[in-house]
Every structure is written in structure tokens, then in C-alpha cells.
């Protein structure tokens, strides 16, 4: 991988660590705070790698914190999946695993502190009134409850906590600046009433802190030095700093924002991905067409390819969209170096070598990976009857066709012999059911004894008498539109009806019969494939195409 210069986040950290800097002499301490209301996707992966990778680069530490302050859609299923995904990518949080909800008591105490300082008040504007009184760029916001006495605020807030009021009756708001040009500073809501069971706290709490209040407090309580987050929180940073500076937290983290990752031909909104799952438009969160990490893993993506992708696109302040083909390019690079080669015939037709002795078979040595001299060779059986791709034979060839056709040029069977097509056999409907050819017994290994030039192509094959049957799933982009998330489009209407093709009756090298997930292979001429981790089983092999051989990424 090419050398990557320091990004702007690292430049800020260098300034903070320098003598006289904000965190001089301190250990860099970051955190990754996913909300456990869905599965991590490739967009989260960029943030994850920035958080864990930055700490790793500076010899620091990174916490994993479940941001579970909103109880509406959070579930332990997602908590477990998030941990699995992070470990799969090669990162570890050690003993620094936390839940935002574990700080509810402390967060409540800080809210009381703000009330006592005259910096927070209980407001009873309804959501509709809140919008009405919020003002605009020329007119300040208004709240008739802003000057409520401190003692009354304390009493009402405690009664909110005790469950004495219905949802929406009261909120706790910060008292900052109703005329601020930054609407996030116009007395934002800090707490709201919600009667909903929390996945960890149960029904202990009926008031829940807003993200903008809870997040800086959680960072400070964990002694985070650098709170790295996506760019939409840039306008929230003044509020983050206001909270940190107005409650008695033990540390003062610095928030730094970076641009989110956008990729064409996909959507990364959890809400939109959830709809695909709930409406059965995909098979689940781990559908290999999904941008979730569990989906990418099932499709055959490797941790190295995803980390390489995120590291090479870099860290920016300006949002941009990356080509999905670049992610494929990174996977292709990784698998080209490491995946074992194998032969698989996906749309088979029988090839009979008429001058090969009946009942005879032999074993040929074929290389496992030409890019890895230490990968060695494997034994592949060969006999009179083989399976080849149906497209490797044409009864009437088109111009420049160099594969098998009657009286055409010699072709090379990969690692085996030279053959020459002599004809074909058809069924009563005129379908080709068998290709006929002769072989040169002196060309074992694929090279003629007399050194003559082979004008035909090299094709792959499988021994029809010693092979494994499999189902093969060919995946392509879930969306046919490069920008399905555009504001003027219904992303559901952009779904690609040809994003999955299922092939049955495929013929594979016998050694693949024992392959198990997460084994990955390059099927010669076909692409890179992996064993499906969910549906494949002994006696019912299922392989997923991770990526095609052809690289469409424009370097």
C-alpha cells in the first residue's frame, strides 16, 4: 500500500500533544460510540478505523461505547453483532467496553447542576409550539418558561424523573442564547420524557438525555482526549463545548469532525437499510448485497481489503462519493495475492476426449497460486469425460472466437493437454449436450512436445467422474442507479432486479467438496468466490461470488 501522509486530524493531535498543547504529556484516548439499533455498515467502518486506528498510531487506547441513550430501537442483538464486526476487522477495546446508559445517574446529576446554576429550565412548550417559537435567522426564539425559578425547575425535573407527567408534557432545556445564529444553541432540549423499556435499564428511567447532552458528558467521564465524529456534528460542537465547560466533569475532550463516507450504487441510512430487510427486499442484514459488515463478510470481503479501502480514501473535511468499484478493487488486490486457485464450471456442458482411453484417469499437478511460490501445487484428476463452460464452445464461431469449435485451432486445457474440437452431439430439440474433441498425449501439462504455437485459448475444466456439485450465487450491485439516495429519487425504485443470479448444478473440483466458510478461492476465469457461511453445508455446497476478475476501477 502506498505511503499515506498525515491527515488533518493527526495534525490537530500533534498540536495538542506538543509542549504547551492541550493534552501535552497525555495518552491519546479515543472512542467508537455506535448506537445499537442496527448493524454496522461500510460507512461506520470508516469512523471505526479512524477511531481505533488513530489511537493505535499514537500508542493510545480506544473505548467501545454503546450509545444506548435512545431506547426506542436498541437491542442486545445489535450489541453482539457490533462487537463481532469490530473484532473481525482486527481491533480490540480490551477492558474498555461501556454503555452510555451506565452514565444515566451521573448525567442526571449534571442536569441538576445546570438547573442550580440557572443554566437549565423545565419547559412545557409542545413540539408544535417549540417549532413555532423557535424563530428564524432574523427573529430570536422565545420560551415563556425561560425565567421559571430554580427551585420550581428542580421540583419539576425531579417529578419528571419520578414519572408524574405524560410524554411530551415537559422537557428540560439548556439556557444558552435564544438569538444565536446557530440554532443548536437556541436553548436546546437536554431531556425528554419517554415511557419505554430500555434494553439494559428496564423501566428504571422514564426521562432520557438527548445525544448532544449525554455524549460530551460520556466522553469526559471516560477521559477521552479526542472525540472524532462525522461532519454533521460540526454545528453541534459549540454545544458540546458549552456542556463540557458548564458542568463539573473530570476532563475536557476536544471534538474533531471529518467527512462521512459516501459510496455510489448503495445507501447507508440505517432507516433505509432496515426497510429493505423488513419488506423482504433482501434476505436479511447479512444479505451479501447489503453494505453491512456482516453482509460484506458473507459475500467474501476480507478485513484487510476493507481496512485498506478506508485507509486509502483517507480522511477529509469535504464530503465526497467513492466508487464502489474501488472497494472491489481493494478486495481483488487482496484475494489475488492470497486466494487459492481452483476450477469450477458454472454452466456446464460435457466434453468427451474421444481418443483418451476409456476407464483411465490420471492426476495432474496444478499450481495453487501463481503469485505465491510457497502456495505449492495440488493434485487434480483428469479423465476422458470433463465438464467445460457452455460458452467455451460454439458450433458456428463468431469472428475472433478462439475457443472450441469444429475444426478450430488447438486449445489448451488448463494444466492438462492440448485438444482439438471435432464436433458435438445434440438432443432431439437441437440443444448441444456434448462436445467432442481429441487430445495430444504428448502435451501433458499444456505444452506440445514439438514446441508448436497454440493458437486457441486456455480453458478451465473439471473431471466429470470426480467432481463436486454446488450452487453458486452471482451477486452484483443492489441498486442499478449510481445515486439511489438522491433527494429526488425513491431508492426502492432504483433496486437492481438482476442483483442476484443463482446457478445450480455447477461442477467444481473435488477438493472443494470439503471447503467450509470462510474459505475463499479464485475460480479460474470466473472470479473470486467464498463458501456461504449461512446456507452451505456438507452435501449442499453454496458459493458466493465476492467480486469478478475484471477490474472496472479507473486508476
Positions of PLM-derived features:
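N-terminal catalytic cores of NTP/NDP-binding nucleotidyl/phosphoryl-transfer enzymes
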Residues: 5-13, 18-84, 198-230
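Residue-level signal for inorganic ion chemistry
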Residues: 20, 51, 82, 114, ...
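Intrinsically disordered or highly flexible coil/loop and linker segments, enriched in small
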Residues: 22, 91, 120, 166, ...
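Conserved short loop/turn motifs at secondary-structure junctions
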Residues: 33-36, 65-73, 95-105, 128, ...
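Active-site cores that bind ATP or allylic diphosphates and position pyrophosphate for catalysis
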Residues: 64, 68-70, 113-273, 331, ...
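A glycine-rich helix N-cap at a beta->alpha junction
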Residues: 78-104, 110-111, 118-121
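Core subunits and conserved enzymes of cellular information-processing
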Residues: 233-237, 241-243, 307, 311-313, ...
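Long, charged, mostly alpha-helical binding arms that flank functional sites
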Residues: 251-330
